[in-house]
C-alpha cells in the first residue's frame, strides 16, 4: 500500500494490531468525566470473573446498580491508587475482590489462569475526543487495557511535511496536561513517524521532556548511531507496534517493567526490556 497520508499511517498501524489480538473500539464509548471505557470494564469482568460479578449483582440488588456502583469503585481506585496499581492489584466492592487485569501465568498448566489471561481485552481507539476542557481536541491513537486507557500516540508522516518533532510539539502545545486522560489514566505518550519514536511519561506543556525510543542505527543492543536500522519495505518504526505493542509483550511490560515512584512513572527505554 502506498502510504501518503497521516491517516493511512495510522490505519496501517491499527490494521497490524487488529490482526494480532487487539480490538477496535469506538471513540464514543469513552467516558470523559470518568476517564474509562466503562462497558469494556464490565465485559472483561463478566468474561474473566463471572462468580464475583454474580456476587456483585446479588449484593447490589440488580445488574444495573452493580454496574454503576462497581464502575464508581474502579474510578475511585484509579484516582487514588493510579493505573498501574489498579491493573496489578484487585479492587474491592462490597467485600468482593475483582481484578482489572490478569498477567501471564508462569506456566500454561493452570487452565483457569490461562483462561483469565486470555480474557484480557486490548483495545485501540483512533481519533479519541478525550478532553473536557477542549471537546474538539482528539488524540490520534489511544491504547486501552480492559477499559482503562494506558498509552497515547501522536502519529506523523513526513510525506505530509510532518515528523516526530511535530508530534512532540503537538503534545507540548496542544494537549492540556490537566485533562484526566493525561493526569490520571495513561502512563506513556509516544511521538511517532515512520523513522523515529520518542516517548514521555509526563506532559508539562513546554517543559515536557521526551526521550528517544529508537533501536539505534544497527538495532537494539548493537553499537551504532541514533535512529533505527534502514529497511527496504515497511517502516523503520514498525518495531513499536510489532514488538512493543505486541499483546503478550505489552501486558508483560505493564505487569513487570513500569515503575511508579510518587508522581514519577519510569517507563523502560526500548533496549532496557
Region spans (language model):
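ATP-dependent helicase/translocase motor core
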Residues: 2-273
Amino acid at each position: 500500500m502506498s502510504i501518503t497520508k497521516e491517516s493511512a499511517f495510522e490505519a496501517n498501524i491499527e490494521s497490524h494490531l487488529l490482526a494480532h489480538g487487539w480490538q477496535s473500539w469506538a471513540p464514543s464509548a469513552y467516558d470523559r468525566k470518568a476517564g474509562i471505557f466503562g462497558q469494556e470494564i464490565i465485559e472483561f469482568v463478566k468474561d474473566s470473573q463471572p462468580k464475583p460479578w454474580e456476587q456483585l449483582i446479588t449484593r447490589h440488588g440488580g445488574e444495573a446498580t452493580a454496574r454503576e456502583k462497581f464502575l464508581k469503585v474502579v474510578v475511585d481506585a484509579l484516582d487514588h491508587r493510579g493505573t498501574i496499581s489498579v491493573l496489578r492489584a484487585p479492587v474491592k466492592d462490597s467485600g468482593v475482590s475483582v481484578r482489572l487485569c490478569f498477567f501471564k501465568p508462569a506456566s500454561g498448566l493452570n487452565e483457569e489462569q490461562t483462561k483469565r489471561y486470555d480474557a484480557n481485552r486490548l483495545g485501540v481507539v483512533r481519533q479519541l475526543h478525550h478532553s473536557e476542557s477542549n471537546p474538539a481536541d482528539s488524540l490520534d491513537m489511544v491504547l486501552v487495557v480492559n477499559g482503562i486507557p494506558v498509552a497515547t500516540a501522536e502519529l506523523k508522516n513526513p510525506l505530509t511535511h510532518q515528523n516526530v518533532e511535530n508530534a512532540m510539539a503537538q503534545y507540548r502545545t496542544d494537549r492540556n496536561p490537566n485533562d484526566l486522560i493525561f493526569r490520571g489514566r495513561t502512563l506513556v505518550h509516544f511521538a511517532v513517524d515512520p523513522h523515529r519514536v520518542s516517548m514521555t511519561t509526563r506532559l508539562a506543556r513546554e517543559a515536557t521532556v521526551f526521550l528517544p525510543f529508537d533501536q539505534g542505527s544497527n538495532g537494539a543492543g548493537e553499537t551504532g548511531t541514533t535512529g533505527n536500522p534502514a529497511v527496504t519495505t515497511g517502516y523503520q518504526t514498525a518495531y513499536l507496534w510489532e514488538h512493543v505493542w505486541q499483546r503478550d509483550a505489552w501486558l508483560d511490560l505493564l505487569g513487570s517493567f513500569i515503575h511508579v515512584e510518587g508522581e514519577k512513572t519510569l517507563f523502560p527505554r526500548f533496549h532496557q526490556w
